[in-house]
């Protein structure tokens, strides 16, 4: 043992005193105590201090007794704790000499060691009470070739360049690195760079070839140099920017001091004072005032050239310009409100009555005091109806009756929640949402805000705008509405919200629950004539530069436009057409074709046809229903009621049913049910027993480009099928609607009022409908009820007995008067 230890000491001394190239010698297997290292790598030639655990301390004490040489090897970080000790350690370590062994101030054992030479571990000889391993020494073996010398020069240069960029590196350290002439020593000394990871250090230790080790070091330091060069450039830019800002700040402070001495004010100081005055005049709530004061103090400390200065300034300007406590509403006068509604809108009596009731309740509750007003909040009114029936103008009339500002906020196509609630101030270009923007534009905290086209809100990955409206329209929450940009509560409880929609089905249920629906149906012809004479014609005369004494539009001309050019539920296209006609008059007056002495120029039906061209709509009912297999049905659409033609045809051939016209699933099922019922009644209808076995049935609903669905065409399809199978014509003065069951029962459907108005517009005055829908006729205008006949039915047999003409009868030989004895007016 003494001989072995002596040989180890001699070898170590030889390595330390002669770092020149050793001669290759046969590998000698030795044994030494081993200290396992946690997350550390020791290189040859390096002196380090280590903290020891119990096992390492025992190994160090054994080594000190035997000759002060010890093995050092790092543990593998991914090795299981219960694995054999040989599997826990890297197989390449270092032989080191213990320079000092003792106790650290914290009571743990410590040791100072000097690395001597690399070692390749063998098997464990002893594991308790300390570790002892077999190993072989792996001294550096190299030949000083020109290539190696050039490699050392490049490594020296790379290390020197990195040290040059590192702050705090002394000249003494640079000189020490330059003085290292041994290639292996040079490579190993770099292993303690703080930029090396544990894995990179172990990889460097396991590289026995000196040239390869130097190449790895060179590659590493070149990467470090590139990284440090970028960091140095960025650091220099930051320092220059900071120095420039500091210099500007110093100069500005000097300029302020000089201007103050001269009695001059600076623009920044003036801006701050102006903002303070605006914020003081804005009558901010306590929470908003504290936030404004905090942001003002912050603004005073920010350089005016900084982007943050503009962001804070814009935010404070928003706070100053919002109408926090500005109210313009007048006490509600119900008589004045009725007068305004009657002036602005013709008809709509039930709608006006509901609005007046709504305003009366607000008036009574306002008289009871603010506390009661907050305790029981009224619902939000939603006007639902076809385009052009006056939904938006009703909101304007309500605002005029209340003496408030009117704001129309179109929601059609809005898909981003932030459009309503605003963008947070962390984003560049952020701003408040449209609700806060409209309040600033209105200049008052109690305007009438009309949420137009609320049924056309969209939804995508940016959020659900309908969900954002829940807080806005909820009377229990909107007194603390928080916009993302302001990040402050704003009281919306005094705002009168109204909404409009063409259809109620697409509005989310939670949003529907917060609103009360007021339905507006389409206008009948007489109402349109009155609206045109009172409102549309005078407005279009002014719009086209005509005086009332220069042009007169007759009632016949208006009816011509209604019936032949604008078959619609509302009056929007009617106004456009009147404008188009009056533009022709204005041009003729300007060109001298009309003698001013002969004014007023009378616009009659003939002039309308000449101005607007070929009529867009004609009464084609008789032409389209002059063959068996065609029946007239009624449909409801978002733009009002209308008629449809259902066609059925029976062709000799294979038994099958074909359905065309882009019909939905419900309509297809109605067609199948209608066919089944007609087949079941074949004998009573006089249809041959094998007719449906030898004929292919085709049902078609024209306007194939328009999707159609719903159950209300059931009796129409059954009537068309019965007509096609029997060869009997369907009456051309009757339209029908109703769902059919397999037993021939006629079931109730919806949209009766709109469908009846659609039939009236199309010139049809007799309608077959389910008996259980008679109650819906109470909503019809009296003028329509007086002109139309409604026939309630319970079964399809009743429908067929009324709608089908007798065999061999044509629509030309049977007059309406002769048919009237079949019909019974609705009771």
From Swiss-Prot:
Domain annotation Lon N-terminal: ranges: 32-225
GO cellular component terms, semicolon-separated: cytoplasm
Chief place of localization: cytoplasm
Catalytic activity field: Hydrolysis of proteins in presence of ATP
EC number(s) per entry: 3.4.21.53
Alphabetized InterPro entries for the sequence: AAA+_ATPase (IPR003593), ATPase_AAA_core (IPR003959), Lon_bac (IPR027543), Lon_bac/euk-typ (IPR004815), Lon_lid (IPR054594), Lon_proteolytic (IPR008269), Lon_Prtase (IPR027065), Lon_prtase_N (IPR003111)
The entry's keywords: ATP-binding, Cytoplasm, Hydrolase, Nucleotide-binding, Protease, Serine protease, Stress response
Induction: By heat shock.
Positions with a binding annotation for ATP: 385-392
Active site: 712, 755
Family to which the UniProt record says this protein belongs: Belongs to the peptidase S16 family.
Subunit structure: Homohexamer. Organized in a ring with a central cavity.
Protein name stated in the entry: Lon protease
Species whose genome carries this gene: Chloroflexus aurantiacus (strain ATCC 29366 / DSM 635 / J-10-fl)
Gene transcribed to yield this protein: lon
């Amino acid at each position: 043992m003494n001989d072995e230890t002596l040989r180890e000491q001699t070898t170590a001394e030889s390595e330390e005193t002669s770092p020149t190239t050793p001669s290759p010698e046969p590998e000698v297997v030795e044994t030494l105590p081993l200290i396992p290292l946690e997350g550390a790598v020791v290189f040859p030639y390096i002196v380090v201090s280590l903290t020891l655990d119990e096992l390492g301390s025992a190994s160090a004490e054994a080594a000190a007794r035997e000759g002060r040489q010890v093995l050092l090897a790092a543990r593998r970080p991914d090795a299981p704790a219960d694995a054999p000790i040989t599997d826990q350690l890297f197989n390449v370590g270092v032989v080191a000499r213990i320079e000092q062994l003792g106790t650290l101030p914290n009571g743990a054992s410590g040791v100072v060691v000097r690395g001597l030479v690399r070692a390749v571990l063998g098997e464990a000889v002893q594991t308790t009470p300390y570790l002892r391993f077999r190993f072989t020494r792996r001294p550096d073996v190299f030949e000083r070739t020109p290539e190696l010398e050039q490699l050392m020069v490049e490594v020296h240069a790379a290390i020197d360049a990195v040290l040059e960029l590192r702050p705090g590196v002394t000249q003494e350290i640079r000189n020490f690195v330059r003085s290292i002439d041994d290639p292996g020593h040079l490579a190993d000394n770099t292993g303690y760079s703080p930029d090396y990871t544990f894995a990179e250090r172990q990889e460097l230790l396991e590289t026995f070839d000196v040239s390869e080790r130097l190449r790895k070091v060179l590659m590493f330091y070149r990467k470090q140099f590139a990284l440090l060069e970028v960091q140095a450039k960025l650091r220099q830019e930051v320092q220059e920017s900071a120095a420039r800002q500091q210099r500007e700040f110093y100069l500005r402070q000097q300029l302020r001091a000089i201007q103050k001495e001269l009695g001059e004010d600076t623009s920044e100081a003036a801006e701050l004072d102006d903002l303070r005055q605006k914020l003081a005049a804005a009558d901010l709530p306590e929470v908003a005032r504290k936030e404004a004061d905090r942001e003002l103090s912050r603004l005073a400390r920010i350089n005016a050239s900084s982007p943050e200065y503009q962001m804070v300034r814009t935010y404070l300007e928003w706070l100053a310009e919002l109408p926090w406590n500005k109210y313009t509403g007048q006490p509600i006068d119900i008589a004045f409100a009725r007068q305004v509604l009657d002036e602005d809108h013709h008809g709509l009596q039930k709608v006006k009555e509901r609005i007046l009731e709504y305003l009366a309740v607000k008036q009574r509750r306002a008289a009871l005091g603010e506390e009661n007003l907050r305790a029981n909040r009224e619902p939000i009114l939603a006007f639902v109806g076809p385009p052009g029936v006056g939904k938006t103008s009703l909101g304007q009339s309500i605002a005029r009756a209340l003496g408030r500002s009117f704001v129309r906020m179109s929601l059609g196509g809005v898909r981003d929640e932030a459009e309503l609630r605003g963008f947070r101030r962390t984003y560049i270009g952020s701003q408040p949402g449209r609700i806060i923007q409209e309040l600033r534009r209105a200049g008052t905290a109690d305007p009438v805000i009309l949420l137009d086209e609320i049924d056309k809100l969209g939804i995508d990955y940016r959020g659900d705008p309908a969900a954002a409206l829940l807080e806005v329209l909820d009377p229990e929450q909107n007194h603390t509405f928080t916009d993302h940009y302001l990040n402050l509560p704003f009281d919306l409880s005094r705002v009168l919200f109204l909404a409009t929609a063409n259809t109620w089905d697409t509005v989310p249920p939670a949003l529907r629950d917060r609103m009360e629906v007021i339905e507006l149906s389409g206008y009948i012809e007489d109402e349109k004539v009155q609206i045109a004479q009172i409102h549309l014609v005078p407005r279009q005369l002014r719009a086209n530069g005509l005086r009332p004494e220069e042009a007169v539009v007759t009632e016949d001309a208006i009816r011509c436009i209604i019936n032949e050019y604008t078959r619609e539920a509302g009056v929007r296209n009617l106004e456009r057409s009147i404008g188009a006609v009056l533009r022709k008059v204005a041009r003729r007056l300007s060109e001298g074709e009309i003698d001013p002495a002969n004014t007023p120029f009378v616009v009659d039906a003939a002039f309308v046809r000449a101005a607007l061209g070929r009529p867009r709509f004609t009464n084609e009912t008789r032409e389209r229903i002059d063959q068996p297999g065609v029946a007239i049905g009624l449909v409801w659409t978002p733009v009002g009621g209308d008629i449809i033609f259902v066609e059925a045809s029976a062709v000799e051939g294979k038994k099958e049913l074909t359905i065309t016209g882009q019909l939905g699933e419900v309509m297809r099922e109605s067609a199948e049910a209608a066919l089944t019922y007609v087949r079941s009644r074949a004998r009573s209808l006089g249809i041959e027993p094998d007719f449906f076995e030898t004929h292919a049935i085709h049902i078609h609903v024209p306007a194939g480009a328009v999707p159609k669905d719903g159950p209300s065409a059931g009796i129409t399809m059954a009537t068309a099928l019965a007509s096609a199978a029997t060869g009997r014509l369907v009456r051309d003065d009757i339209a029908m609607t109703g769902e059919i069951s397999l037993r021939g029962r006629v079931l109730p459907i919806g949209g009766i009022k709109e469908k009846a108005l659609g039939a009236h517009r199309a010139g049809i005055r007799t309608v077959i409908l389910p008996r259980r829908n008679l109650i819906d006729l109470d909503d019809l205008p009296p003028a329509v009820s007086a002109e139309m006949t409604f026939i309630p039915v319970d079964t399809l047999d009743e429908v067929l007995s009324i709608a089908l003409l007798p065999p061999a009868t044509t629509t030309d030989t049977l007059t309406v008067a002769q048919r009237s004895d079949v019909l019974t007016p609705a009771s």
